[in-house]
Amino acid sequence: MSIVTNGNLNKYFQQIKNLKEEFVKKYNSGESTEEIIGKMRQIHGQAIFEDTRNKFQLAKNNKLNPSDFYNLSVDYCTLANMDKKIRHLEILQFERKHKGYTHKGLDTDKYEINRSLIRSNGPLVGTTQPIQSTQANQISMTGKGTQDPVNKVRPEIRKDDDGVDVISLHNTQTEDVTTRRVNSDVIPTEFNNTMNTQNQSNSNYLNTTEYLTNLSNTEANRLMSDYNNGNYELTDSQKQQGGNHIFEVGKPTVVNFYADWCGYSRQFMPNWEKVRDSVKKKYGERIQLSSLNVGQDTDKVNISKNAGVNGYPTVVIFKDGNTYHKVAGNASADDIVKFIDETMSR
């Protein structure tokens, strides 16, 4: 039986979340927020003390099982997440007080506490200073992305000096070129042998990482509009021993972005499998599902950021040129299915 539990830490986490909402209201009305920040730090300190006491009891026992190590990881993530939320608000407060920062009010109706960034309709507030979101990746807190005009994308394939197949997506309007090396066995024979654009656009096959890289780097909305008849190959999370799954870009695609080092990601996995089963029964071939283990791979981390992911696990739906996000760490299977249902009804 596990000795360590994180139930008490969740109590402190909820208190900080509630104070964060209070901070937003006072911040928008121009009132002082210093007292709220002070309360949040006190609560965080209480959580640290509680965690230290748990660790002390654990150290005295000297008999740890796998569940104990799992909970240690979850507790660490919980404490770190508390501090991250407080730091974001401290930065807001500091910039307004010391730098003459002219703020734009935080919209509480479109404000989701679970995100590691505070997003409003205007600025995105991160760990340094507010940055203006671009039209391509701007996402409101209701989940719907900003839609761009459709640009034409032309796929091209060639072999590099090492004889490795290289696939490029060439945006003919912006002149952006996304190039990726791929194994020849993931590109069908008719694609290798046929170089005209019409046939290529109907025969695109890539693995999960390649698909998401191209989807995000050339902007999901443009690709989805332009490749309605194209196919990509995504590695299905249940077939990681070599099996592959053909995904059509024109269909809604649900991706679970997770990291194997994250306790919340591991905790969410059983719920994700329930989501998969439920969605497949309900929607059949109308929805495509996959997972991407970001791990500590730099390319995959960039992919997740380009897709609007700010923490793990996060479920992202690519639909009709828009992206919709749901932070899944504390979400139940029913929560995710409801999120998918609401998105599909848009």
Curated annotation (Swiss-Prot):
GO terms for cellular component: virion component. Keywords: Virion. It comes from the Viruses. SUPFAM superfamilies: Thioredoxin-like. InterPro entries: Thioredoxin-like_sf (IPR036249), Thioredoxin_domain (IPR013766). Pfam families: Thioredoxin. Its main location: virion. It is found in: Virion. One of its GO terms (molecular function) is protein-disulfide reductase activity. Residues 212-345 form the Thioredoxin domain. PANTHER family: GEO12009P1 (PTHR45663:SF11). This is Thioredoxin domain-containing protein R362. It comes from Acanthamoeba polyphaga mimivirus (APMV). The lineage of its organism: Viruses, Varidnaviria, Bamfordvirae, Nucleocytoviricota, Megaviricetes.
